[in-house]
Amino acid sequence: MDRVVGGKFKLGRKLGSGSFGEIFLGVNVQTGEEVAVKLEPLRARHPQLHYESKLYMLLQGGTGIPHLKWFGVEGEFNCMVIDLLGPSMEEFFNYCSRSFSLKTVLMLADQMINRVEYMHVKGFLHRDIKPDNFLMGLGRKANQVYIIDYGLAKKYRDLQTHKHIPYRENKNLTGTARYASVNTHLGIEQSRRDDLESLGYLLMYFLRGSLPWQGLRAGTKKQKYDKISEKKRLTPVEVLCKNFPPEFTSYFLYVRSLRFEDKPDYSYLKRLFRDLFIREGYQFDYVFDWTILRYPQFGSSSSSNSKPRPTLRPAMNIPVPSADKAEKPPIGQDSRERFSGVFEAYTRRNGSGTGVQADQSSRPRTSENVLASKDTQNQERPNSLSRNLSSSRKAIAGSSVRATSSADFTENRLSRLIPNNDRSSTTLRTQFAPSSSSVATKAAPTRAARDITLQSLELLSIGNSKRK
């Protein structure tokens, strides 16, 4: 007999696992909606699922914020039921041969800045900005960027008094070393400026294909972090952003000039990239690089590329810079399984003929609002008390895989909850989610995974008539 959690969510096959517990595909038996179900043992050494669910509730209502369906205790487990989302930026990056065009980066940057700003308005720092923590939506939200993984989020000010947390030093590094700010490496308490600096590194990673401090070798994690910190501090932003528009240098110079408690001028940062977008003659048509790879005819009409796209080749042949931890070897069949579930959902939801939408409910008509979103309005909207939150399989996996979490999630305990489920997969990686700690990176997908990607994207609705 299949197990049901929350009274209506039937558990299916396992999607992934980690020190936090395991993630399963689920379905709402009343509506047929597919969901992701995250299970955490009640006796976990560092339980965090309850904390994460509270973050979802506090952030609910914002554009690009996933929605939680249900949270509660079922048997020996904390359970969180979340909507499925599409692939992560890291997965799309691999799909695009680890290189994004300037147009794609600028379209993503505008939404990503909005997401970070929204979290800050709500009083929280994300503290783990990286490609794996930004996902695309499904169906009518297929071109909307979602920010996920609130396991390391921290409240930086009191929402009533607006009192900022105090400046501190000698802090351990929290987040992912590759994208951490210089001040974070130096042990300084993080604030809003650090999320934005991390986002800048993310954008340059997309443009360059890698960052100068990737692939450094060291004997211990501390030595590795020290080497990354030194290389990052000794790399001038002008060198980091060389051969790319000066707006990226301006971005770094601004965010690094902010003091600990300063409120960033998010509008200035978005305006930098919006003006560049217009000057390059791009159209905000939601035609991303991954769209062009599947539908080349859209490339000629969208002015999508500031440079020739690399030839699509098997991802296993793409050199992937070493992670901030030891890289995992390619996993063959596991990679096929890792991709299949998400693309099944991606195909079904995006091939329904409903079209896709991003932040705007209608196509922009003026240059001023060509990249604008509804985030500003959502930031002023009061929180609803309903527990209607959502995330992806990756959200649940990535948000909880922290180095400090080491719950013993045994197969015997799991079998009592889901006696008939296939538990053959023991990999710590899940669909479109890093399941190692925040400082890990994923191996490039296999040729089989790429084939699944191509097949599933065939039904993606991208016609202009479908965009509203």
Curated annotation (Swiss-Prot):
Active-site annotation: D128 (proton acceptor)
Biased composition annotated in UniProt, kind: Low complexity: 383-393
Enzyme class: transferase
Gene Ontology molecular function: any one: protein serine kinase activity
Short name of any one Pfam family annotated for the protein: Pkinase
Any one Gene Ontology cellular component term annotated for this protein: plasmodesma
Record keywords, A-Z: ATP-binding, Cell junction, Cytoplasm, Kinase, Nucleotide-binding, Serine/threonine-protein kinase, Transferase
Superkingdom as given in the UniProt entry: Eukaryota
Domain Protein kinase, first and last residues per copy: 9-278
Binding locations of ATP: L15, G16, S17, G18, S19, F20, G21, E22, I23, K38
Job of this protein: Casein kinases are operationally defined by their preferential utilization of acidic proteins such as caseins as substrates. It can phosphorylate a large number of proteins.
Family assignment from sequence similarity: Belongs to the protein kinase superfamily. CK1 Ser/Thr protein kinase family. Casein kinase I subfamily.
PANTHER family: CASEIN KINASE-RELATED
Name of this protein: Casein kinase 1-like protein 13
Species this protein is from: Arabidopsis thaliana
Name of encoding gene: CKL13
